[in-house]
Amino acid sequence: DENPRVQALAKKSRAGVIDGKPVSKNKVFQYRDAIFEAALHRFETDPTMVAYGEENRDWGGAFACYRGLTESLPYHRLFNSPISEAAIVGTACGYALEGGRALVELMYCDFMGRAGDEIFNQLAKWQSMSACILEMPVTLRVSVGSKYGAQHSQDWCALVNHIPGLKVVFP
């Protein structure tokens, strides 16, 4: 592949220890690299796939997971969105209902509340309300963690895990 990030990842170690010695953090394949590879593979195999969110194209999204995709994808498949969590998730729902597959990102888990209706009532329920005639192939990526302040460090996983129709996945 001619993608510069793919070439750089080919040189990284997929193990943290080689010959009993720890590999430098800069030389180890990271979780964000796995997200990049999985997304690139899906983009190559599914022409309906799109990805968007705040700063996804320009900065690579949260933790630079999408950095390098700009070299492989046209703007209409990977793009920046306005700062409107409800619009991000709402348009993903609409796109999925029309047969597309969306990989959308909210910068922080805390902002899921800004898209509450779209996540908890639309995204989670359309498939079951249609007796599985409609599918909702949407992946919503959010950052969960600490060190970003009181309104950027919450973990809503327990709440989301109790909503029928949603799945929570962690590395």
Label for each model-derived stretch:
Residues 2-171:
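Thiamine diphosphate
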